[in-house]
C-alpha cells in the first residue's frame, strides 16, 4: 500500500497545494489592501505632499 501523504502534516500533495494556493491568494489580497491604505494615507497627510 502506498502512502500519498506529504510530510509531517498528513496532507496529500493535492491538499497541500490547495491550501497553499489559498494562502497565496490571501497574501495577495492583504498586500493589495495595504498598498491602497498606504497610498491613501500618503495622499491625506499634508506634510508628505
UniProtKB/Swiss-Prot annotation:
It is found in: Cell inner membrane. One of its GO terms (molecular function) is electron transporter, transferring electrons within the cyclic electron transport pathway of photosynthesis activity. A bacteriochlorophyll binds at residues 20, 38. Keywords: Antenna complex, Bacteriochlorophyll, Cell inner membrane, Cell membrane, Chlorophyll, Chromophore, Formylation, Light-harvesting polypeptide, Magnesium, Membrane, Metal-binding, Transmembrane, Transmembrane helix. It is a single-pass type II membrane protein. Belongs to the antenna complex beta subunit family. This is Light-harvesting protein B-800/850 beta chain.
Amino acid at each position: 500500500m502506498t502512502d500519498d501523504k506529504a510530510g509531517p502534516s498528513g496532507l496529500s500533495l493535492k491538499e497541500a497545494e490547495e491550501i497553499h494556493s489559498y494562502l497565496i491568494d490571501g497574501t495577495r489580497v492583504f498586500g493589495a489592501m495595504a498598498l491602497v491604505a498606504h497610498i491613501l494615507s500618503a495622499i491625506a497627510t499634508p506634510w508628505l505632499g
